[in-house]
Amino acid sequence: MERTKWTIPIVALGYWSAALTNGALRVIVPIYFASRGVSISKIAFLFFLFKFAEIFAPFGIGVMLNRWGYKRTFITGLAIHSVISAFYMVPNFFFLYLERFVRGLLYMADMSAVYVKHFSAKENQRFLINMMLGLKEASKGVGMIGGGLLIAILTIENTLLIFAAFTAVSALVAVKYLPDLQEQVKMPVLKIWGAVDRKIKTLGLSFGLLNGALDAWGVVVLPVYLTHLGVTPTFVGTVMMAEYVFQGLIVTFFSKYVNLRWEPRKLLMLAGLLLVPVSLALSFAATLHLFLIVVFTYMFLFSGAMVYYNHLMIEFASAEKTSLDLATYTTLSNIFKPIGVFVSGILVESFGFGWAYYLSALFVLFSALTCIALPKAATQKDQAGDYRTESVTVR
């Protein structure tokens, strides 16, 4: 018991250190390569590879968690995160493509969420999962401003080595102190999809469409558009940092006081319907200040919806096969991200920035409509969910 009380902080340290690096790359990659004349579509392809890998990552991670155990999978992910940062030392786009794809496969969210499911009391899980995922966004924001500042004074290689040190230290801490857990249910890969409850699939699909909407303008278009408005790379990093820190704080604190008596299904539909006009408003925001106001309005609504998605994700996942249920959910929640990034890059180059926001509005609308298929109230009655459950083995 003494050992397990530090489990969530150790997992959070590793998860947030990986998010720090991912956040830095969100700023470093588009700014660095755009300054060297690389086209928007080619930069978008780098992020497309990352998002494309995220489609396949959850099932791979889920199977590894189910077969290898939680600790070995978590440490392996952090170690690879550290190693591939060195790929930027090789002046060849092949290694950049490889780094983007491999980093996308290292989906730390599921590696962390399984620990929340099994190593925390059920009444605390809603807050802990939203705190972990919310402050992950804040860590990403800190990485963005850190990356923007460091790339201004250091080479891209040295900048990435600094961030690699954070994940390396987190991996060493996990090796020493993180407990292991083995799931007893071992399901054949080809039977996973059919064994997962329909409500988890519906929830994942809806959140996937919402994620696709955000990434359609928030990954490549946002930093490039801000640069197009004449702002400095440091300002771009500051805006993106503030955006993600804002999201992280909203998710974390809103989850503490959210009223779960409100039906999540209706709230998710309402949030989606409100985001449609906000997405369209981005295309009409002609000045920098107005544009930023609309961006943060979008992030406020998105973050509020995210609290309910995160809560229902943990609530719907079974204790016996947590990793496989979450693998299905996160696969669906990631499937539209590369589509949003890649298609918006083509649309922007062909028709202008406004088309990225039109695409975003379309994704949001489909997300809201998908919520109609969710159950009217959470019906998950499974009370097994902490490290004492008989369906798992702690080591």
Describe every region a protein language model picked out:
Residues 159-175, 357-373:
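Symmetry-related core transmembrane helices of the 12-TM Major Facilitator Superfamily/SLC fold
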Residues 1-5, 178-211, 390-395:
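Juxtamembrane intracellular "pre-TM" segments in multi-pass secondary transporters
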Residues 2-51, 199-239:
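Helix-loop boundary and gating motifs at the non-cytosolic
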Residues 72-86, 164, 266-280, 361:
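Structural signature of the two symmetry-related core transmembrane helices
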Residues 101-138:
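Cytoplasmic helix-loop-helix junction between adjacent transmembrane helices
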Residues 16, 94-109, 290-304:
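Hydrophobic core of transmembrane alpha-helices in multi-pass small-molecule transporters
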Residues 265-309:
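C-terminal transmembrane helical hairpin of 12-TM major facilitator-type secondary transporters
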Residues 57-69, 151, 250-263, 348-349:
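Helix-to-loop junctions at the C-terminal end of transmembrane segments
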